[in-house]
């Protein structure tokens, strides 16, 4: 089961990165292999944001939808994502955001991923590092795009 952790400095305000990660409806615009994304439900309190969302992931001939449960602890700046249904046997990713200053933040990203299909899971294992880096870069590129748009 592939698992990876990275800590990276983003040259963008924490609030921009935070909003970007939670803007699931727009993942289809920038996230590799994401062909559609939609928030199904969202509840917000003063300390938590609770989201259920569907993401359609496609690569070559394979395409599938998985539903995820996203919990954002506003005070801890921690986002936890788990798969609820779909082709993923295991999906857990954790984002922890730390403000460095008004224009920079540190992003800790951990992903633990396993597909239900054994053959596809073996293929995933071989390209996991590449995919992980590509996904993280897509968030960084999107942050740059949003920063330049303001």
Language-model features, listed with the residues they occupy:
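Intrinsic-disorder/low-complexity, polar/charged segments enriched in Ser/Thr/Lys/Arg/Asp/Glu/Gln
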Residues: 1-7, 50-52, 65-67, 78, ...
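Hydrophobic ligand-binding cavity/cleft-lining segments
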Residues: 1-48
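Hydrophobic/aromatic beta-strand elements that line small-molecule binding cavities or substrate pockets
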Residues: 6-8, 37-39, 66-72, 92-99
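Hydrophobic pocket/interface hotspot
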Residues: 17-20, 27, 53, 70, ...
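Glycine-rich portal/gate segments that line the openings of hydrophobic small-molecule binding cavities
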Residues: 39-84, 138-141
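Beta-strand/loop substructures that line and gate deep hydrophobic ligand-binding cavities in soluble
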Residues: 82-130
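Membrane-proximal extracytoplasmic alpha-helices
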Residues: 131-135
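Short, highly charged C-terminal tails/helix-capping segments
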Residues: 140-150
